[in-house]
Regions:
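Peripheral (often C-terminal) accessory segments that flank ATP-dependent C-N-forming ligase machineries
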Residues: 221-327
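Short, flexible turn/loop "capping" segments at secondary-structure junctions
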Residues: 68-70, 140, 290-295
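A short, glycine/Asx- and small/polar-enriched loop/turn
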Residues: 61, 184-191, 291-295
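Conserved N-proximal alpha/beta basic substrate-recognition cap immediately N-terminal to
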Residues: 1-48, 296
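Active-site "cap" helix and flanking loop/linker of ATP-utilizing ligase/carboxylase catalytic domains
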Residues: 158-180, 186, 196-258
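Internal nucleotide-binding/catalytic subdomain
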Residues: 77-190, 197-199
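Conserved anion/nucleotide-ligand pocket segment
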Residues: 61-80
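Generic preference for hydrophobic
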Residues: 44, 66, 104, 126-129, ...
Length: 327
């Protein structure tokens, strides 16, 4: 993203700008900017060496999260419950950082939310907030179920929307698509996990299309061409409860092991409420326990009159895919 922003800037083409690109791809710079602008977030500290990292971990406290400063896909992300955990994982985290830097952040308990915000001529337009449910264990950062609309309401929902918008403004995104990830505590306090300036993965573009009738790809293409974006392309056209169930190993429906056979999606797609599904598996591949975003090997999107019904349908349909493995 920083390279694309620099090229666009040099050629006088539409883009998000080099400063914003840096802020939205480098987690330490992002945290410092959010702190300066008063956006709520966890405690954090940067680290390049073991000595700096130990001080950072002790300053932030435990539990905490260790991440590369400039990577993604849950690569090099670890939960820390002690200084021994930090010592064990620092090398792996730094190895995933192109700049050789890591960040330690306070671990926030609560419900994680995925946000979608469209920035248009300096205005931040909130599109969706959805639950991002995560598996237990080492893959705790991987979203394995998305549920729209979010299961919070009232003040907590209003605060989550306010913080998402504030984060986008703080990072200087004037035109583009933003992906703020938030944590909402049991008391309704909202903190920012991070914010990306892109169409997110994890079928979030499909969520926007099926849930609110907005085509993020069209918006992004029009903005890249410098076109004006009319209201009907950026504001929700309807609100349809839905859920996305990713196909993963436990706690998902897939077995672990070397794939021997992958059944068809016919039964999955025929299940009531299912609007889209896909599988990313081939014979000979190995299904591993959930650790990275890439361990999601497919998905099912289902709708319903309520988000709970949509979730029940997505989970049930995902269980209909027949996969045989050699253990």
């Amino acid at each position: 993203m920083p390279v694309v922003a620099a090229v666009a800037e040099a050629l006088g083409l539409p883009g998000i700008g080099t400063e914003t690109a840096h802020l939205m791809t480098h987690k330490v710079a992002m945290r410092r900017q959010l702190a300066e602008m008063g956006v709520p977030q966890p405690r954090f500290a940067a680290a390049r060496t073991l000595a700096e990292g130990r001080l950072a971990a002790e300053t932030v406290g435990f539990p905490s999260v260790l991440k590369p400063a400039d990577s993604g896909g849950q690569r090099g992300v670890f939960r820390l419950d002690s200084i021994d955990d930090f010592d064990a994982h620092l090398h792996a985290a730094v190895a995933e950082s192109p700049t050789g830097e890591a960040i330690v952040e306070g671990f926030e308990e609560g419900l994680e939310l995925n946000g979608l915000v469209i920035a248009r001529n300096g205005e931040a337009i909130p599109l969706t907030l959805s639950d991002r449910l995560r598996p237990p264990g080492i893959g705790f950062g991987v979203g394995w179920i998305h549920v729209y609309p979010a299961t919070i309401y009232g003040h907590a929902l209003e605060e989550a929307e306010r913080v998402a918008i504030a984060a986008v403004h703080a990072l200087g995104l004037e035109n583009g698509i933003a992906f703020p990830q938030l944590i909402v505590s049991d008391s309704g306090e909202v903190t920012v996990v991070e914010v990306a300036a892109r169409i997110p993965g994890g079928q979030m573009a499909d969520l926007a299309r099926h849930a609110v009738g907005v085509d993020l790809v069209e918006v992004a293409l029009r903005q890249a061409l410098g076109e004006e974006i009319p209201d009907e392309l950026v504001f929700p056209q309807f609100r349809q409860p839905l859920a996305i169930r990713f196909l993963t190993a436990e706690p998902g429906p897939l077995p672990t092991g070397k794939v021997q056979r992958v059944g068809t999606l016919d039964k999955v797609l025929a299940f009531p409420g299912v609007v889209q599904a896909d599988v990313f598996l081939q014979e000979g591949e190995t299904i591993r326990p959930v650790r990275l975003d890439g361990d999601r090997r497919g998905y099912v999107i289902a709708t319903g009159d309520t988000n709970l019904l949509a979730l029940e349908r997505a989970v049930a349909a995902a269980g209909l895919l027949d996969v045989e493995v050699e253990r």
